[in-house]
Amino acid sequence: VTALPPHRRGVAWVPQDGALFPHLSALSNTAYGLRTHGVPRAEARREAQSWLDRLGVGHLAHRKPGQLSGGQAQRVALARALAARPRLLLLDEPLAALDQTTRAHVRHTLRRHLAEFGGVCLIVTHDPVEAVSLADRVLVLDDGRVLQDEPPSEVTRHPRSPWVARMLGRNAWPGTATADGLELAGGGHLVVAEPLAPGTEALAVIAPEAVSVHREKPTGSPRNVWPGTVREITSGGSRLRLLITSDRAPDLVAEITPQAAAELRIADGTQVWTGVKATEVTVVPL
């Protein structure tokens, strides 16, 4: 590959800043790769316009990069890369500059294209949603070390470190397996449905939506119940995430609806009880 001139390598790259040619319009930028491959001008412009339309910036075809917002420029850069028909597609944080709504639309378009893409695509991202929704395989790196290299579904179900689990928005508690669960490194005991061999170093993973929140101590089915205090409330789309601290368990993140929060009169500093069913805990050996 290194012996070939760049335009013959079949590689397209989208850097974080887009790197559009400032003297060319969005349309000419997008058609550039096709023209270097010898595609006639009219055909290249038609295909370029089609890609701009798919990514929601077709109406900006005749604008120069200096006339585009950061999110618009990023979509044009993505259109330019996809239009070039590469064998290797390199995407560096391709959706980072987009707002939430646009990101979902572009992610859908990109996923549809990658499903039909015959080449190799390498995506670098800090967004776990982006990684698991676009990739066939996820390689998780931390400080240069490979923490996990598996299909997205396996990474989501069985994260191999607290860092990976928390990156995916899960509660992650390391500990040592006992006959009925896990003795937590941060203090406390967790009952699980499928315990490992006693003495095994393991990681308990709990989804925030699996944590029930009550104002009174629950008397129902949860095997794991702790008192705690709400320390932080953040909005995550249509749900609220609560950071709950306790002297009987490590910090816990719960996810509830705004309606449930209103009914429970949840606020910063509210005293609550949390519950986790044993069947909702995934235990991964370390």
Task: List PLM regions with ranges.
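ABC ATPase nucleotide-binding domains
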Residues: 10, 16, 20-160
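Non-catalytic connector elements of ABC transporters
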Residues: 171-286
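Residues that scaffold the ATP/ADP-binding catalytic core of kinase and kinase-like folds
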Residues: 4, 98, 155-158, 167, ...
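Tryptophan-centered motif/residue detector
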Residues: 13, 51, 163, 226, ...
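Phosphate/pyrophosphate-binding loop motifs in nucleotide- or prenyl diphosphate-using proteins
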Residues: 7
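ABC transporter nucleotide-binding domain
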Residues: 151-178
